[in-house]
Structure formats: structure tokens, C-alpha cells
A protein has these predicted regions:
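Residue-level signal for inorganic ion chemistry
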Residues: 6, 33, 90, 114, ...
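Hydrophobic residues at beta-strand termini and immediately following loops
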Residues: 27, 76-77, 168
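Short glycine-rich anion-binding loops that position phosphate/pyrophosphate groups of nucleotides
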Residues: 10-13, 56-57, 82, 115-118, ...
Length: 194
């Protein structure tokens, strides 16, 4: 089973949106999150979608799902106080859904994706699933096109080669058993943001 876990619990503070969180901003007649959800909803290998959302915006999201005929969303849950907590809550909801379908965590692949990032392709989703099937996890990366500067502990600066540098993107995909175990271990160790 392949489940997209979409986190959309942010309030858009960095973007300074006052009227609504950025995932619900209108873009050509649709909230941004709907474009993201359509990508996963239309993908033939995605079985279900879980969304972690700002609790007060859940009714609005439910209305938009009906309006734009997004059919694979099986759970909408209140997001957490941080992106990390929203992801964990989404993973727990994905686990609950998979278990309700008698599918184990070992058999379940989750694709963790940000609700405000609709600019991915069907091929990216397919590649993530295939790579998890092959090696157990996959983080979408693109080649770095700008110069990166890394500050060392002694304040010295290092400029790594662009040819050797990549930018991590979403989705980030895993076998559910691995990522939920990592989250639970980190929480047990008192690490809330990792």
C-alpha cells in the first residue's frame, strides 16, 4: 500500500499571509493545496492520502475536497505545533489506516510531502515508490545550481563543488515501519525536531 502523507499544518508566518495560511491561498481558482493533492489523487500507484491540517481549516479543506473531487483522502487530522509533529501525526494516521486494511507497516510505503509544493511530476512520485521498493527509502533531490557555502565549527568557510552538491526536496519516502520507528525513537529520547 502506498500512502501520501501531506502536511499542511503551517500558518504561513514566514510568508506573512494575513487572510489565510499559504496552503489555502487561491491560485487560478483553486487553493494551492488542491493542486498538490490532485497530483497524488491522480497517481495510479497512490492508494490513499492522509492530510495533517490546521484544525480550524479542516471544514474548509473538506469542502474543497468535495468541490474538486479529490477522492483518495482517507483521513484529515489536526496538525501539530511543528512541522515535525504534523508529520508524526500523519504517519500515525497512515499506520491506523493501513492496519484497518490489514496491511502491515512493513508493506506500507509513505510519501511525505508538503501541501504547498505542487510542482512535482507523476514521474517523481513513481520514482520515489520504486526506489523505496528497491532500497527502503528515497529523498527527492535536484542538482545544486547555486553556490553553497558551509560554515565550519571554527567559522572557516568551505565551498563544496556544485557537481557534488544536491538540494533535498519533497517527497521524502520510506517504508512506514522505518520512518515511524525513527520518529518514536526520537520522541522517546526527547528529540522533538530532527
Amino acid at each position: 500500500m502506498n500512502i501520501a502523507v501531506i502536511f499542511a499544518g503551517g500558518s504561513g508566518l514566514r510568508m506573512h499571509t494575513k487572510s489565510r495560511p499559504k496552503q489555502f491561498l487561491d491560485l487560478n481558482g483553486k487553493p494551492i493545496i488542491i493542486y498538490t493533492l490532485e497530483l497524488f489523487d491522480n497517481h495510479p500507484n497512490i492508494d490513499a492520502i492522509v492530510v495533517a491540517c490546521i484544525e480550524s481549516w479542516i471544514p474548509f479543506l473538506e469542502k474543497q475536497l468535495r468541490k474538486f473531487e479529490i477522492n483518495k483522502v482517507v483521513k484529515i487530522i489536526p496538525g501539530g505545533k511543528s512541522g515535525q509533529e504534523s508529520i508524526y501525526k500523519g504517519l500515525c494516521a497512515a499506520e491506523e489506516y493501513a492496519q484497518s486494511k490489514s496491511v502491515s507497516n512493513e508493506e506500507t510505503i509513505v510519501l511525505i510531502h508538503d501541501g504547498v509544493r505542487p510542482l512535482i511530476t507523476e514521474e517523481t512520485i513513481t520514482d520515489n515508490i520504486k526506489k523505496v521498493e528497491e532500497v527502503g527509502s528515497c529523498i527527492t533531490c535536484i542538482p545544486a545550481t547555486e553556490t553553497l557555502i558551509v560554515k565550519q565549527a571554527d567559522d572557516a568557510l568551505e565551498i563544496p563543488s556544485r557537481a557534488d552538491s544536491f538540494i533535498a526536496r519533497a517527497p521524502q519516502s520510506f517504508r512506514l515501519i522505518d520512518i515511524i520507528t525513527a520518529h518514536r525513537r526520537s520522541l522517546a529520547e526527547g528529540k522533538a525536531d530532527f
